[in-house]
Amino acid sequence: MIKLKNFTELNSQEIELIFKWRNHPDINQFMKTKYIDFEEHLRFLKKLHQDSSKKYFLVFQDEQIIGVIDFVNITTKSCEFGLYAKPNLKGVGQILMNEIIKYAFENLKVNTLKAYVFKDNRKALKLYQQNHFTIYDEDKDFYHICLKQSDCKALPS
């Protein structure tokens, strides 16, 4: 069973765990901000209480923490998402992706789900394309991808 825990409800151990993951080289190599200090991390978590355009979740599978999913720039029409798995944990990308798609379309009720993917993050791009995301633009560093809810309704659940 999958459970989402909002970052605004994390306990002290979870706050520290997320901080360590966020600065782990396997994770931050594909982040725009490469390193954050603990004070910055705490400020970020505090700001989430007042910012309705962002939602971050710790993802549990059968009581085990498996990763993080997030939604930013949330509007009535669209949002951007991000995800990362627990360092050294393999095979959970699709589980995290399923939760992103479900939460965005069922809870946030957006029409379009978007992300920016580092061009050298082939693993992530493959996962997104397997989930019917399409590249709609690109720049020097990123592919811009999206999935429309109308495309998703035709997919098997």
Swiss-Prot record:
This is Acetyltransferase PseH. Catalyzes the third step in the biosynthesis of pseudaminic acid, a sialic-acid-like sugar that is used to modify flagellin. It comes from the Bacteria. It holds the Pfam family Acetyltransf_3. GO terms for molecular function: acyltransferase activity, transferring groups other than amino-acyl groups. Signal peptide: none annotated. NCBIfam families: PseH.
